[in-house]
Structure formats: structure tokens, C-alpha cells
Amino acid sequence: MYKKAIIALSLITVSGATLASAPVANLKVTGSITPPTCTIKGQNEVDLEYVFDVSPGMFPVSGNLLLDAKTNSIEVVCDASTYLTFSSTDNRASSVLGTSVYNFGLGLYDTDQKVGFYTITMKNLTVKADSSSAAQAVGASNGTSYLSSLTIDKTKKMAWATAVSTLKAGQIFSADLDVRPTLSSTLKTSSGDAKLDGDATLTFAFSL
């Protein structure tokens, strides 16, 4: 009889636990991820102009004419710390003289004659952690090469970095962009309507 009482009590206890309503706590995690906002010289879109004056007398006796480089500076300011890269698009790609990932087209003259090409070199790169910090000199990386001065490869992204695969985070990014044209030797005998008409777009991207 004693044994039966124990069994009965055990069954009642289990049944009571099954019927009881347990308290529940729902844990919810909310929030938003806001990417940084970056501008170039305080604007979303700017034009960097390079003007070259060329005369027939500047051409060598034979071969193409290589002009001296001209420089423009860029400064990208972000409202939060980020990594910064950019890709390049040659809007005159069909007019490139010679085949190279480094050459950008300079347009056409006499309907279908190519003016030449130009290269863009990125140098004097710096990054500031914020507006009150000192600028830190860094290098340029395209994912496979890392140098203090690097010619832009149209097929790769350029980045402010401290090594090939190590991008540098910050809020203020600066660099000089050197443009150096090479003009076709055929321009010496052109009809006079030739002009340099290079046009490229640098599209910046940033990440947390």
C-alpha cells in the first residue's frame, strides 16, 4: 500500500507540471546599420580638369609625343571611419592608342584617327582618422600590387592601404592624381581639328 501511494503521488506531480503555464521572455535585437556618407571636396560629384596646350613643334622627329604630367589633388571626407576604394571607367575606351589596362583614350580626330592615350598615377596618399588627427602617409593597392605611387589599372579597384591586402580605415582620404598623355605621331600632319578629349569616371566605394 505504501508503494502504491508513492507511485500515485509521482503521477500527480508530473501531471501538475504539464498543466502549469510557464513564463516566457522574448528577446528581440533591433537596430540599423548606416553606411558612412562621403563627399569629394564637399560634393557628391566633381570634375578634375587637366588642360594641355600642344603645338606641332613639340613633336619629336619620329615617334609619339610624351607630355609632362599634370597633377590634381582629391580629398574625400566621410562622416564615419571607413575603408575607401574606387574603380575607373574609361568613357573614351574605343579611342585608346595601343592596348593596355593602364591606357585611357584621348578621343578621335578626322573621324576615326586616334589622338593617343593617357595614364593616371595615384601618389602622395594620406589618411586621417578624423578631422583633428594628423595625416598618415599610406600607399596605393590594387589588390595585387602595393606601392607609394601606383598607375591606375582600369580592371582593378584602387585603395588607400598599408599593404596589398590591408586597407587603411579613416575619415579623410587624400591623394594626388597625375595625368600624363602620349600623343600619336600622326597628329603632326593632321588637318588641325584634333583635340585632346579624354574623359574618365572614378567611382568611389566605402564600407564599414
Could you tell me what each predicted segment is?
Residues 2-8:
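Sec-dependent signal peptide recognition
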Residues 15-17:
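N-terminal signal peptide c-region/cleavage motif recognized by signal peptidases
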Residues 2, 20-208:
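Mature extracellular/passenger domains of Gram-negative fimbrial/pilin and adhesin proteins
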